[in-house]
């Protein structure tokens, strides 16, 4: 039997695939309150021309509209990639109770990998953290995306060089 964290992380992975199909970094988020999905999101920064349009931001904004409150007390956010500093701040300000993420972000992770903003005792709210839920699957998806993106850029660069030399 699949556990609850894996169930919702699988939903977040499906949303990450939507992001990837739109040319976005494949990150998906599912916000659950009282065992009910309240809102979802996937990265849309490129599509919306908005650097804040991360999966977490989109899900929490949608949840605020849904529950008519900016506080997400007793809610859990499931996200395929550890939140960045901006999204970590969002989790603290929205009073999310628990964060569950898949892959660690060794460059900007703010739930323990680089910083631990969500559990910083100097802040007025701390978020409980559960990490590495389906982490290998989330990590593999992200690695494959960036590998493909680098190959595309390399091919474009080589094509441009060829045009210049002709």
Predicted regions located by residue number:
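Helix-adjacent hinge/juxtasegments
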Residues: 53, 57, 61-94, 98
């Amino acid at each position: 039997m699949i556990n609850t964290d894996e169930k919702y992380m699988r939903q977040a992975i499906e949303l990450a695939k939507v992001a990837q199909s739109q040319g976005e970094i494949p990150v998906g988020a599912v916000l659950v309150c009282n065992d009910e999905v309240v809102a979802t999101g996937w990265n849309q920064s490129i599509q919306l021309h908005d650097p804040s349009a991360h999966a977490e931001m989109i899900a929490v904004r949608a949840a605020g509209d849904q529950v008519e409150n900016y506080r997400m007390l007793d809610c859990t956010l499931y996200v395929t990639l550890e939140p960045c500093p901006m999204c970590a701040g969002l989790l603290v300000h929205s009073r999310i109770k628990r964060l569950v993420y898949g892959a660690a972000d060794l460059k900007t992770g703010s739930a323990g990998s680089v910083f631990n903003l969500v559990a910083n005792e100097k802040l007025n709210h701390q978020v409980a953290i559960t990490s590495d839920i389906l982490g290998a699957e989330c990590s593999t998806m992200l690695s494959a995306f960036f590998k493909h993106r680098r190959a595309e850029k390399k091919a474009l660069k080589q094509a441009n060089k060829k045009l210049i030399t002709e």
